[in-house]
Amino acid sequence: MQNKFLICDDCQGVNCKSLEKKLTKLDPEAEIEIGCQSYCGPGRRKTFAFVNNRPLAALTEDELMEKVEKQLQKPRDHEEEERLRKRNEERKRRKEEQDRKLKEKLAQRKHK
């Protein structure tokens, strides 16, 4: 089964371009999805990536890559990955809902 990496192009702690290059070098066949991962809290202070739906974070990109390599060596549990995928989707959905409500409130304040 193909590995999948999810990285954020919005968080302060993530250098998307260099991280994407390192992940591609590590596994050229992996699918890499770039976009908001709704992992903003840790993403302010740490670099992170989701590896097969499992979040991994570290203070530096090199430390993160060590964790990614270790994670890729572990046997994959497809049921666990599916559970994590659903959890990640729900987290993104909740963040989108919060953002939508905030925009509505701001729009209402402008019209007053």
From Swiss-Prot:
Keywords recorded for this protein, A-Z: Coiled coil
Positions of the UniProt region annotated as Disordered: 68-112
Coiled-coil stretches noted in the UniProt entry, renumbered to this chain: 75-112
Domain of life: Bacteria
Family: Belongs to the UPF0741 family.
Name of this protein: UPF0741 protein SSP2119
Species the sequence originates in: Staphylococcus saprophyticus subsp. saprophyticus (strain ATCC 15305 / DSM 20229 / NCIMB 8711 / NCTC 7292 / S-41)
Lineage of origin: Bacteria, Bacillati, Bacillota, Bacilli, Bacillales
